[in-house]
Regions:
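Charged alpha-helical initiation segments
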Residues: 1-45, 57-64, 68-79
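Polyanionic, low-complexity intrinsically disordered segments
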Residues: 2-20, 142-225
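Hydrophobic aliphatic residue packing
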Residues: 45-48, 207
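Helix-loop junctions and short alpha-helical segments
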Residues: 47, 59-159
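Extended alpha-helical coiled-coil scaffold domains characteristic of the BAR superfamily
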Residues: 49-53
Length: 225
């Protein structure tokens, strides 16, 4: 799973560069904010995409690990279904006498393609979608509570911390959706919504910390057989 975390980190570095460009254009070139604020909006969209891509990657990897008996099964995995043709193909390539003639005839490759097909219809962004996806590979019953503790989210108790995590993530996703799906136009005024550099920086830090907390949780020793 290290490769997926490294890819996520690289995507986040690229996303952060947009606010760096924004600051340079604002402070050194003195371009008005209305002409460059789309850089910040693009960064917000990109960090959510990076997180979604990261989750898709580790879920696929985790399911393959379960199939290979190196990761502990979860109840959600036990109810996960594959197409009949995929099952037949797996049985064929797993036969002791089968000799693969290409990389497409390797168990892990077949599984990854099938998982990519199934998961491509899903987005792992909102708190409920995130926990549902992680249930395929992580048996923890109180996922948000564990993640909020790892991230040191503020709150007077573990449930308040969990609620604060969910609220922060929901706010980021809602703002992302306004940009990506609504043209980021305020319905009443028909003018573009404003966006603040600090808000984008905080959102970026939050998504980065969340992904790393997820990685630490799903790669813990007790997740493996």
């Amino acid at each position: 799973m290290n490769n997926y975390l490294a890819l996520f980190d690289n995507n986040m570095i690229q996303a952060r560069s947009l606010s760096t460009i924004y600051i340079n254009l604002r402070d050194n070139v003195h371009i008005e904010d209305k002409y460059i604020s789309n850089l910040l909006k693009a960064q917000l969209v990109n960090i959510v995409s990076a997180f979604d891509m990261f989750l898709h990657g580790i879920v696929k990897k985790g399911v393959i690990e379960i199939f290979n008996k190196t990761r502990k099964e979860t109840s959600k995995f036990q109810s996960f279904s594959f197409q009949a043709k995929t099952i037949l193909r797996l049985l064929e390539v797993m036969s002791p006498n089968f000799i693969p003639s290409s990389s497409d005839e390797i168990t892990d490759v077949i599984l990854e393609k099938e998982l990519s097909r199934q998961l491509s219809f899903m987005s792992f962004q909102s708190p409920d979608k995130v926990t549902d996806a992680l249930s395929l590979i992580w048996n923890e019953q109180h996922k948000i509570q564990v993640l909020s503790d790892k991230m040191e989210i503020s709150g007077s108790n573990i449930n308040e911390k969990a609620n604060n995590l969910k609220q922060k993530l929901t706010t980021i996703i809602q703002r992302r959706n306004q940009i990506a799906h609504e043209g980021d136009i305020e319905p009443t005024t028909q003018l573009p919504r404003s966006i603040e550099l600090l808000d984008v920086e905080l959102a970026t830090d939050f998504i980065y910390a969340l992904a790393h907390a997820v990685f630490d949780a799903v790669t813990a020793a007790d997740c493996y057989s």
